[in-house]
């Protein structure tokens, strides 16, 4: 939805009276902000004690305004762009009168408020710009274009990290017309690109890059590059690219800005060119993360936690794979027993009954049945990962394989989870959690399936499973494995 949420600053910190829980688990707190169609409240999950922000949307107003399609698109976009520098959508709920967006609560407020106090130091501005570019690049790789980037839509968490918010004006790649361009006029005047003003068609990726350039200028200068009391005069300056960098801007920064605020979108920097720029690269680290149990997990944080215990082993492990170094070394008590599948699980695994695609955008996957021990299956997955230089993460009977190469849609990430079918049979479900679909299919066909086909369990005879929902050809009479096709194959 394209409305502006106004922050409330004068409301009391505590609620004057207790309220009923929203859908049984959220305790509503103070009003954080409001717009034409929605109000945003601070809330607390009474089960986890976690603070969240809940956007409460008036259904009647949305219906009258014809904005249902906007709501659906915003939900779809927020589900698609899960990144440490993007405000996360946890869940969506609805009643007869209201729609609730349960979102990450970002405590630090708008970046705009920080810039309003004066220009930032170069290293601070660079950090925010790096995080902004990381987030926007991630969005574009998934076919999402923000189209309203500005400091008011950039929030800061308690650790001073940037979070991109407000995807109400965002577009997705399937909205592109036959000419390969977008045609909707949107955005905030001071941050809008010249080609949008021309009202001809525009490349939304290049429009976001222009906005990032304006934001960088504002962070470093403390004021807008294109400013005039008269809006039409400001538009003329934008269209002509008329701006001056202050004397305290370094030569490197000035050159970068000239490429970001290039009026010709064909000559404007692309994201790969930005990330190769010398000013941008200072102190930059690629953000590595993965999604587990519906939560974002930072790879760097895991490494730091393990660095003390691993430090003394570095010399002796120099010849070992990097996979072993990154993998958690907690192996007390052996592997737990896999979760057992009930009849409903087995039915959902059968072709035509798998509903996971309704909830998971990256639902591509395969399943196979094996009579081999869980430890042997996990070892085989680790072996495959080692050959292709993938990082391995293990938790109980789940294994995550993460590629090091930054593909078109980020690094390829594959999750494998093992379930108990019978005392001597397990089902292994393999899914793509991130990265390009073609790259995933190549990996499965050339690496995963050929190597797993040879997997056997010593001295184990698999017993038949009398469940009609499972394809008979998928139940082996020997310890060898057999792939069950998923609904995406």
Swiss-Prot record:
Its needed co-factors are:
Mn(2+)
> What enzyme class is recorded for this protein?
transferase
Induction summary: Repressed in roots by salt stress.
Record field: catalytic activity? L-seryl-[protein] + ATP = O-phospho-L-seryl-[protein] + ADP + H(+); L-threonyl-[protein] + ATP = O-phospho-L-threonyl-[protein] + ADP + H(+)
Binding-site residues, ATP: 32-40, 55
The GO biological-process annotations, alphabetized, read as: signal transduction
Whether Transferase counts among this entry's keywords is yes
Q: Where is this region: Activation loop?
A: 166-195
Q: Name one Pfam family in it.
A: NAF
Q: Where is this region: PPI?
A: 363-392
Q: Name one GO molecular function term.
A: ATP binding
* Keyword Nucleotide-binding set for record: yes
Q: Which domain of life is it from?
A: Eukaryota
UniProt modified residues of type Phosphoserine: 170
Q: In which tissues is it expressed?
A: Expressed in roots and shoots.
Q: Which residues carry this modification: Phosphothreonine?
A: 184
Extract the coiled-coil ranges from the record.
none
Name the Enzyme Commission number(s) assigned to this protein. 2.7.11.1
Q: Where is the NAF domain?
A: 336-360
Active site annotation, chain numbering:
148 (proton acceptor)
The entry's keywords: ATP-binding, Kinase, Manganese, Nucleotide-binding, Phosphoprotein, Serine/threonine-protein kinase, Transferase
Q: What does this protein do?
A: CIPK serine-threonine protein kinases interact with CBL proteins. Binding of a CBL protein to the regulatory NAF domain of CIPK protein lead to the activation of the kinase in a calcium-dependent manner.
What family does the Swiss-Prot or TrEMBL record give for this protein? Belongs to the protein kinase superfamily. CAMK Ser/Thr protein kinase family. SNF1 subfamily.
Task: Let me see what the UniProt entry remarks about domains.
Answer: The activation loop within the kinase domain is the target of phosphorylation/activation by upstream protein kinases. The PPI motif mediates the interaction with the ABI (abscisic acid-insensitive) phosphatases.
| Assembly with partners or alone | Interacts with CBL2 and CBL3.
Question: What's the name of the protein?
Answer: CBL-interacting serine/threonine-protein kinase 12
What is the species of this protein?
Arabidopsis thaliana
Organism phylogeny: Eukaryota, Viridiplantae, Streptophyta, Embryophyta, Tracheophyta
């Amino acid at each position: 939805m394209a409305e502006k949420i106004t922050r409330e600053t004068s409301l009391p910190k505590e609620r004057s009276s207790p309220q009923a829980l929203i859908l049984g688990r959220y305790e509503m707190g103070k009003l954080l902000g409001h717009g034409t169609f929605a109000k945003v409240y601070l809330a607390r999950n009474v089960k986890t004690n976690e603070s969240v922000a809940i956007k409460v949307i008036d259904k009647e107003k949305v219906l009258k305004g014809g904005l249902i399609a906007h709501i659906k698109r915003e939900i779809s976009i927020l589900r698609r762009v899960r990144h440490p520098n993007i405000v996360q959508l946890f869940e969506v709920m609805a009643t007869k009168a209201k729609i609730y967006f349960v979102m990450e609560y970002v405590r630090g407020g708008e970046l705009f408020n920080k810039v309003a106090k004066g220009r930032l130091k170069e290293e601070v501005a660079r950090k925010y710009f790096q995080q902004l570019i990381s987030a926007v690049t991630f969005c574009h790789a998934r076919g999402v274009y923000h189209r309203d980037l500005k400091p008011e839509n950039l929030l800061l968490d308690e650790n001073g990290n940037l979070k991109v918010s407000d995807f109400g004006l965002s577009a997705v790649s399937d909205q592109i017309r036959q000419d390969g361009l977008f045609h909707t006029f949107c955005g905030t005047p001071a941050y809008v690109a010249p080609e949008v003003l021309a009202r001809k068609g525009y490349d939304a990726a290049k429009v976001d890059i222009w906005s990032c350039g304006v934001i960088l200028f504002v962070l470093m200068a403390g004021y807008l590059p294109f400013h005039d009391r008269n809006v039409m005069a400001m538009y003329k300056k934008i269209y002509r690219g008329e701006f001056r960098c202050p004397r305290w801007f370094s030569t490197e920064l000035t050159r970068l800005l000239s490429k970001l605020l290039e009026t010709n979108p064909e000559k404007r920097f692309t994201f790969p060119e930005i990330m190769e720029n010398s000013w941008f690269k200072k102190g930059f680290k690629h953000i590595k993360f993965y999604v587990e149990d519906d939560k974002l997990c930072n790879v760097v944080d895991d490494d730091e936690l393990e660095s003390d215990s691993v430090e003394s082993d570095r010399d002796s492990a120099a010849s070992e794979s990097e996979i072993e170094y990154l993998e958690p070394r907690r192996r007390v008590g052996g592997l737990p027993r896999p979760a057992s599948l009930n009849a409903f699980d087995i039915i959902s695994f059968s072709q035509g009954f798998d509903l996971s695609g309704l909830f998971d955008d990256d639902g591509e996957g395969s399943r196979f049945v094996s009579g081999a021990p869980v430890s042997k299956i996990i070892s085989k997955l680790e072996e495959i990962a080692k050959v292709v230089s993938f990082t391995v993460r293990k938790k109980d009977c789940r294994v995550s394989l993460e590629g090091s190469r930054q593909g078109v849609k980020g690094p390829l990430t594959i999750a494998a989870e093992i379930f108990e079918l019978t005392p001597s049979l397990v089902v292994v479900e393999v899914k793509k959690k991130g990265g390009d679909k073609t790259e995933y299919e190549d990996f499965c066909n050339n690496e995963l399936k050929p190597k797993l086909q040879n997997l056997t369990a010593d001295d184990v005879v698999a017993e038949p499973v009398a469940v009609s929902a499972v394809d008979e050809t998928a139940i082996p009479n020997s310890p060898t494995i057999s792939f069950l096709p998923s609904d995406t194959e």
